[in-house]
Design a protein with these regions (language model features):
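N-terminal Rossmann-fold NAD(P) dinucleotide-binding loop
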Residues: 154-155
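Adenosine-phosphate binding glycine-rich loop
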Residues: 6-10, 246-352
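NAD(P)-binding Rossmann-fold cofactor-contacting core
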Residues: 164-188
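Rossmann-like adenosine-cofactor binding region
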Residues: 192-279
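N-terminal ligand-binding/catalytic initiation module
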Residues: 1-123, 129-131, 141, 318, ...
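Glycine-rich Rossmann-fold phosphate-binding loop(s) that bind the pyrophosphate
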Residues: 150-151
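Short helix-loop-beta connector
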Residues: 138-144, 166, 228-229
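Glycine-rich phosphate/pyrophosphate-binding beta-alpha loops
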Residues: 118-122, 235-241, 312-318
Length: 352
């Protein structure tokens, strides 16, 4: 059984590789070669006000590489105010750590093949998935990005977009101005492109070719009316998107053929915004994510406003993790990375 660290994962998983892995994944999914159990979240009360325990799981099988993967995240989450906005954050334990695990099983023998944390892989998978969507929906000449958010996932969005478009300029806004400035400076230094912090969300959106929302906000971070003809809009979190965008955009990808996130909570104890969250009605002509990825449906004109919301990213989510984690495990073995542990430590001689 191969034990990997985030550093190991980073050494074998490039953003470009991940885009290719997901592109093939959706090809195989279209042939019926993927099985997914959708994301499930369980919520329990916590002693601290506005704080909850959350266990998040999802899983999937990809027989074309002989892997079945289960993702388990165990978190304590809390809400906090940041200026006029409400934010959600995961509370670290011990020495500043979080618990997120991917278990990789063989579909040929049933044994546990590998264990790895999900941190670097998750950021890369999200960036690659949204890049794949942008490859189909953004204008071919798109080169300027308006980015809302300055955290871990926000950086992943730019790294992904650079795999499918020649990005030359990024305008970034965050309600945390100090972090936004540091983020812009670091991203510009690492990528060698112009990354400029701006004073308002509207300044970031105006005249951008691609508008990427990647915040930890519990409410909308921009107005749908700001979206301009020809722009491609995406959102990593459900609550950060103005629901009117579903009506205002010309081409919208949705995921209504699969159950949405399954939330389980003890009694009435659950974050209110989780309990109240409902998907907006699918607009006429909306494209199901299943058909979007299988057929690689693209924009129809230069002035078309396109939208790839969070719900679309959840299509075959467990299977996405299986494909990427399976690729990482195979590549790590090829390169001699990780620590081999006796499989007997994780097996038993009793049949339950």
């Amino acid at each position: 059984m191969l034990l990997l660290t985030n550093d190991d994962v980073e050494r074998v998983l490039t953003m470009a590789d991940c885009v290719d892995v997901l592109r093939r994944f959706f090809e195989e999914e279209g042939k019926g070669q993927v099985l997914t159990r959708q994301r499930t979240e369980s919520w329990l009360p916590h002693l601290t006000t506005d704080t909850f325990y959350q266990c998040k799981t999802m899983e999937g099988g990809v027989p074309y590489i002989g892997k079945y993967v289960i993702r388990i995240d165990s978190n304590v989450t809390r809400k906090r105010q940041q200026g006029q906005s409400s934010r959600v954050e995961h509370v670290p334990f011990g020495n500043g750590s979080w618990m997120g695990t991917l278990l990789v099983f063989s579909t040929e023998t049933g044994e546990l093949l590998g264990w790895m944390p999900d941190g670097y892989l998750q950021r890369t998978r999200v960036g690659a998935l949204y890049a794949l969507a942008a490859d189909y929906l953004a204008r071919p000449d798109a080169e300027e990005v308006g980015l809302l958010g300055s955290g871990w996932q926000a950086g992943g969005q730019i790294l992904g977009l650079r795999c499918v478009r020649t990005i030359k300029k990024v305008r970034v806004f965050s309600s945390n101005t100090d972090r936004c400035s540091r983020f812009a400076e670091e991203l510009q230094a690492s990528l060698g492109i112009e990354v400029r912090p701006v004073a308002t969300a509207r300044d970031a959106v105006a005249n951008a070719d691609i508008v990427a929302l990647a915040t930890n906000a519990n409410e909308k971070v921009m107005e749908s009316s700001w979206v301009e003809p020809g722009q491609h809009l995406s959102s990593v979190r459900f609550l950060e998107l103005d629901p009117r965008a579903y009506e205002d955009c010309d081409r919208v990808v949705v995921n209504r053929v699969e159950p949405w996130i399954q939330n389980h909570y003890l009694g009435e104890l659950c974050p209110q915004d989780i309990k109240d969250a409902k998907l907006p009605p699918a607009p006429p002509g909306a494209i199901e994510a299943r058909e979007f990825f299988r057929q690689r449906i693209k924009r129809t004109g230069a002035r078309e406003k396109t939208l790839f919301p969070n719900e679309a990213s959840n299509y075959q989510l467990g299977g996405q993790f299986a494909a990427v984690a399976g690729f990482v495990l195979d590549r790590a073995r090829e390169k001699g990375l990780g620590r081999d542990l006796p499989v007997e430590w994780f097996a038993q001689t009793l049949l339950p």
